[in-house]
Amino acid sequence: MAPQASALSQTLESLTLSKIRELEKQRSSYEERKARILADAENHTDLYSRVQTILTGTKTILPNATRDVVVLNIERWLEQHCFDPSVTHEMLQEYETELRSRLDAHSRKLSLADLYSRLLTEWTNADGEEEGDVSEEDYMVVDERQKQRLQQLCDQFEQVVFSPLQTDSGEIHEFFDSFFPDDDKVEALNSLRSDIKSSSLEIFEEEAPFDHSTLTATIKGLLTEDILSEAKQEVLKDFLKNKVALTEIADVLNMRWADLEEWDWFAGEDGIPVLPRQQLNGKYRIWMDEDVLQLIFVQYIGTRLCNLLKMTLKDFIDSRKVWNWDAAPPMTEEDKARYSYYIGSAPVGYGPEATRRSDYIDEYFLSQLPLSLTTLADGGAPYDDDDDSEGDEEANGGWGPADAPVPAAHRQIKQRLLRKIATETLVQRVIYGEAAVVQSDLRWYATGLPHSTIFAVMSYIGFSEKWIGFFRKYLASPLNMDKSSEGRTPVGPQVRQRGVPMAHSSEKFIGELILFFMDLAVNRTTGLLLYRLHDDLWLCGEPEKCAQAWEGMNSFAKVTGLEFNLSKTGSVYLSDAVNPMIESRLPKGPVTFGFLALDPSGAWVIDQDQVDAHVKQLKNQLDKCDSVMAWIRTWNSCIGRFFKNTFGQPAMCFGQRHVDMILAAYKAMQDSLFGNGAGTVTQHLRKMIEARFGVSDIPDALFYYPEELGGLGLRNPAISPFLVRNSLEPSPLKYIADFQQKEMDQYLQLKKNFSELTQAAKTNRYTRFMSDEENRYISRHDRDTFMPFEEWSRFRWSHSSLFFKLYAKLQDVPDAKGIQTTNEVSNALRQVLPNINSLDDEERWIVHMYAPEVLKNYGGVSLVDKKYLPVGVMAMVKEKRVKWQMVL
């Protein structure tokens, strides 16, 4: 830990201990005074005097008693009793019981506050010990097998990056030329090249681009990438706080920029250290440990080129000269003429095709690239394959980044894509008869990219030789792996021959630049959209087109020197009459999103084998937690987020059956972790607390209540699915059946309208919509026969508003149906929360579920008063995210 952080930790620890000691003093004092009050009360033989004694003591020792309406009312009624016999003996007994319950409730609150503080102390002490065991530049291996896997990772990395793979630039250019077969497309390509060249040269020739603003954006962007050691993160954070430092850094980097053509690594005799470092998600990846100023410099360059590429290519594909946006064959002039005659108006584009196009451009196309210099700093553009098990420069066992610093909107991009693929597959299968889905990714993509391919593509798209020359030097980095793993024979720095640095902006720029041409290849040859999140790839549509697209992707990979990861490649062919020729051209293997798999029936099901393996891994992780709070955080990180994401977000395209599968999976997981039907998570935690602290009388609410109300915030995974379960149909086929019925009703109504036209009206319509050239489209016989249903419905994608509604509906997520709020609980919440709407639906469910017990035993809805808790240390330790260890 950095010295400043350590000093802060020690200060907070000292303050925490002081607060805990003060709490213990208050608790002891309260219990002593309470005991004296009750003892004094027992000395009184008459009931009135006893109640009066307890009342006086309550007002003395109970915080806020003088403002407690119930206490004040009892005081008034006791005065009334002296003069009015209507205040009966039984009523006095009730007053006594009420006052005693208030005293006992405060005792329980102080006891829970004491327990809470001890739990926090245990957590912070354990956390400090962990930090002391591992230096900032080291990595942990938990057993010999893990050490071997890490060694294997380093060996594979070394084998790939220092072994050149030469590709043929002429062959690449010729392959790309085939995407531009006519003059219009060549003109568009030349315009693209001109824009890229001029805009990139403007960046290259800028004067003094570094100032406080650009440095702040670049540094903040770096801090979101999880590529820096803790020490270097602290250095960058210190830069952001120091304007003098920013000014000096800007001066140095502007001098480097002025001599950009002569830039080099200048890494010295030892080169750039390369180390495997464990990320928050538990994966080990191979990182270059470059100089901080050099890192800022190249990060800025990469980000600016990302911005340029994204804006330019989005404009490029928006043109129909270049890109095929038709989800189905478009209307011909004959189709339009016939439609106009039979319907009585020209066709209007109300179908989902336009939305599908805008979704692709705005959400999925080049989604890895930041759109501006501040995008990364603002939390935009990052994507990581949450359940990746074999990828670039990494080794893991399948755990995803449950606490990785990725904004919610961008964590959800894969969920939105899942719904998109599920919807289009469902529609294609049910309405059009058959569908196929293809999934793949590229093996060691960023690590193994041939440099010759990079330069060929940069040249083809219009980057000047100045930029290509810069990247020749940048990619040929002198990497030193001598300290990457134990027992390595020192060989000194070696020049990188393949690949780009992981997670840098340059990787985004180069990686997306290369794969843009795969997007283009698929679209130009088949009209399909390649849904791609970096190098994770999905196709869906007609089986023949999917097979053709897969062949085109393989041709692209061959010419560019890329390789598909066969362990993550597969397809599903859904049809009542599978064509063996088409099937043989599709890749073998399953199609999965997280733990959801597309089965041969077309349903998305939870892969229980994967779940079981991860539950076993979770149990190992939980068993290694050395504090109760760490156990809860690990549980929340996995159960509350990781599994929630990998099971897929409930949606209309999955139906209620999917929610029931999620609930069944959670139940099976808890049975596996805590014993089949014999234990629960709260029983397990009670046993932990009793064994460590000797406390057993703990309400369930303490575990599940949110921290704002004095709880530990334990996640109950069943609540989130229950919030939406009743907002879904049992099967998504119900939505399609409803659409088909409405579509047929609409067709029959239009047919009826046409049949009721007089002959004169038909003649008038024919004259109105048919030119001399178009009159051949409708024969004399057809003038009196309404168009067939197949012809009328052929253009759903472009012209059906009903189909648009179905397409949007299937991708919707259901509205949460929260628990009904009672006045009693709402009033209690208002007494302790400045805004009761700050609780989300899940928290409200929990609060109401346990409110009767809490209100009865704790005198309100809050379990522990915040003033008794060491909130500073809570905030500090919560900043440290859960890091998975059992992952190799």
Describe the residue ranges of each PLM region.
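Non-catalytic, polymerase-adjacent accessory regions of viral genome-replication enzymes
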Residues: 1-353, 733, 739-888
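Active-site-adjacent bridging/hinge elements
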Residues: 267-278, 425-430, 472-494
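Short, conserved non-catalytic motifs in the polymerase core
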Residues: 275-295, 488-510
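Active-site-proximal segment of RNA-dependent polymerases
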Residues: 290-291, 295-440, 444, 841, ...
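Catalytic palm subdomain of template-directed nucleic-acid polymerases
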Residues: 451-454, 459, 538-558, 606, ...
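Short, conserved secondary-structure transition motifs
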Residues: 476-487, 570-585
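Active-site palm subdomain of RNA-directed nucleic acid polymerases
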Residues: 509-552, 556
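Active-site and adjacent loop segments of nucleotide-processing enzymes
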Residues: 562, 579-888
